[in-house]
Regions:
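Juxtamembrane loop-to-helix connectors within ABC transporter transmembrane domains
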Residues: 23, 31, 110, 130-175, ...
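ABC-type nucleotide-binding domain
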Residues: 351-352, 358-605
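Helix-loop-helix
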Residues: 180-194, 264, 268-337, 342-343
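Transmembrane helix-loop-helix hairpins at lipid-water interfaces of multipass membrane proteins
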Residues: 38-102, 183-187, 298-302
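Transmembrane helices of ABC transporter permease
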Residues: 33, 37-50, 61, 162-216, ...
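Alpha-helical segments in transporter systems
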Residues: 28, 36-61, 92, 107-111, ...
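An intracellular "coupling" helix at the cytosolic face of ABC transporter transmembrane type-1 domains
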Residues: 33-36, 134-135, 153-160, 164, ...
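Short intracellular "coupling" helices and adjacent cytoplasmic loop segments at the cytosolic face
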Residues: 4-6, 10-15, 115, 123-147, ...
């Protein structure tokens, strides 16, 4: 099934492995803005860890005291000193309360840092979208872009929030526990440490395997999102052409790829914990055997054995957490790289230092030897030249693929010409600020774009500071006022997300009203009367006539009957102007335009 707007699978199988180090370096650069918060996180995380580390040693003293009391009671002594044990346990409880408080504070601060980073990245992505050239959106699917704003940023935030804290606590725990273990028994410490090389080797093997699958998981999630968005937006077309089975088959293929990559990545990451627990238990058994032997030899106390056993457990926990952190860092790096790739995409050329500003534009437009191709290997417009006087009505006609819509994109500087120049009032459009240039243009497209909101707000989009009276006046000039009054709520009626609660013709009248309100000097009308009934077409044509009065107008239409009164008709074929003149002149030539015109009437007949 054709993918329509979604396009192809760009780079799915050929994309290179992520640059883990480079991506994490960029992420660290982003985090420098929050260095004070991160410093506090480090301080409180270390403080919480230290209190936890000291706990087992103190608890070991209580165990030793209990053991000595039992021995004393058996041998006829004073027995167990419960007061002393109680004091030890109260002190231990205070330590754990402080540890919990510090942990809460560092968690609160780290959550704030991660959410601020999320907010900043989403803001930068939103701003970046406005600066990207149109060519980027032609090659990327909506789902892929949406995935970067939602899935990738969320993944980055969540994994960063968890991994950053665990890295700090794990490192602090390993160092602190090692010191406490050495203070109890260097020999037992050596036995416990011997598990590290085995653990690190296993972690490295699993991380290396899982890294590729995590990246594939993020990619395929974007493809699935894109297809769902596309099918939902065009579900009527899918049903009309009985393509439900094709859509389901295509979704199943994409979903199966997502399933396989997600299954492999999650399976490998799930293996880390059992393997690390097994290795930790081996060390635990070895320490228990050696500790019992040293206690018999009176080298250490019984309470020291208990403390050391807890330290061994606490020593293996950070190793297991390192495995989890390595897993989360892969997700962080995969999501971060996709976000950074988007933020580093080439932008539209910056505005010139001293851009041209026209206070009273006249609307003269000139194409001088324009050459253009969407890629350098394939030029679709060859040496296009024409001069348009202010207020003229110019029609551009030709078969599909002739380059008509491309001319509009060049006028608006959605793309820049490969050769030659386009001038407005004698100034190359590259000398203008893009925003200033586009303010001189008004567009009425076949694909009418209306947003969720009231009808009045949609019309006012052409001029945000317009009054209600201005909106009504523009709607009246666009022959939209009458039908708006018949709608429930009138100008206050809310359009839904697809604007499906008004007809196609009404949508076009609203976009014409929007253009009239904006009062541009140059108009671009792209097949604006297609897909509507004859009566509505007449009404739209009258509205357009009002809109075009005193304005330079470029009309792109396949219905040649609508552009008979054009001042100049440009006939395009394969990127070149093959004929030029008024309607009657072109018919008299009996050339390509006449063939197009006559073929439409033959089809109608």
């Amino acid at each position: 099934m054709p993918r329509g707007r979604m396009g192809g699978r760009h780079g799915m199988s050929t994309e290179k492995a992520k640059d883990f180090k480079g991506t994490m370096k960029k992420l660290m650069g982003y985090l420098t803005q929050y260095k004070i918060g991160l410093l506090l996180v480090v301080i409180f995380a270390i403080g919480s860890t230290v209190f936890n580390i000291v706990g087992p040693k103190i608890l070991g003293k209580a165990t030793t005291e209990l053991f000595h009391g039992l021995v004393s009671k058996v041998s006829g002594g004073s027995g167990i000193d419960f007061d002393k044990i109680a004091k030890i346990l109260i002190g231990l409880m205070c330590l754990y309360v402080c540890s919990a408080l510090f942990s809460f504070i560092q968690g609160y601060i780290m959550t704030g840092v991660s959410q601020k980073l999320t907010y900043r990245m989403r803001k930068e992505i939103s701003e970046k979208i406005d600066r990207l050239p149109m060519g980027y959106f032609d090659k990327m699917t909506h789902g892929e872009i949406l995935s970067r704003i939602t899935n990738d940023v969320d993944t980055l935030s969540q994994s960063l929030n968890q991994s950053a804290t665990q890295v700090i606590t794990s490192v602090a725990t390993i160092i602190g526990v090692l010191v406490m273990m050495l203070s109890i028994s260097p020999l037992m410490t050596v036995i416990a440490i011997l598990i590290l090389p085995l653990s690190m080797g296993l972690i490295g093997m699993i991380v290396k395997r899982s890294q590729r699958y995590f990246k594939e998981q993020q990619e395929y999630l974007g493809y699935v999102n894109g297809q769902v968005e596309e099918v939902y937006g065009g579900h009527n077309i899918v049903k009309a052409f009985n393509k439900e089975d094709d859509v389901i088959d295509e979704f199943d293929r994409d979903n199966d790829r997502l399933y396989r990559s997600a299954w492999k990545s999650q399976f490998l990451s799930g293996m880390m914990m059992p393997i690390m627990q097994f290795v930790g238990n081996l060390g635990y058994v070895a320490v228990v055997i050696l500790g019992g032997y040293l206690a018999i030899k009176k080298t250490i106390e019984v309470g020291d054995i208990q403390s050391f056993i807890q330290y061994v457990r606490n020593f293996t926990q950070p190793i297991q957490q390192v495995a989890q952190v390595a897993n989360m860092l892969q997700s962080t790096a995969a999501a971060s790289e996709r976000v950074f790739e988007f933020l580093e995409e080439p932008e539209e050329e910056a505005a010139p230092e001293n851009p041209v500003v026209l206070k009273n534009p006249e609307g003269a437009v000139e194409f001088e030897h324009v050459h253009f191709g969407y890629n350098p290997e394939h030029t679709i417009i060859h040496d296009f030249s024409v001069k348009v006087e202010p207020g003229q009505k110019i029609a551009i006609v030709g078969p599909t693929g002739a380059g008509k819509t491309t001319m509009v994109k060049l006028l608006m500087r959605f793309y820049d010409v490969s050769g030659g120049s386009i001038k407005v009032d004698g100034h190359d459009i590259r000398e203008f600020d893009r925003g200033e240039l586009r303010r001189m243009f008004g567009m009425v497209l076949q694909d009418t774009w209306l947003f969720k909101g009231s009808i009045e707000d949609n019309i006012r989009y052409g001029k945000l500071d317009a009054t209600h009276e201005d909106v009504v006046k523009a709607a009246d000039a666009a022959y939209a006022h009458r039908f708006i009054q018949t709608l429930p709520g009138g100008y206050g009626m809310e359009l839904n997300e697809e604007a499906s609660n008004v007809s196609q013709g009404q949508k076009q009248l609203l976009t014409i009203a929007r253009a009239i309100l904006a009062d541009p000097k140059i108009l671009i009308l792209d097949e604006a009367t297609s897909s509507v009934d004859t009566r509505t077409e007449v009404r739209i044509q009258k509205a357009m006539d009002n809109l075009m009065k005193g304005r330079t107008s470029f009309i792109i239409a396949h219905r040649l009957s609508t552009i008979r009164d054009a001042d100049l008709i440009l006939v395009m074929k394969e990127g070149d102007i093959v004929e030029m003149g008024r309607h009657e002149e072109l018919l008299a030539k009996n050339g390509f335009y006449a063939d197009l015109y006559n073929s439409q009437f033959e089809q109608t007949a």
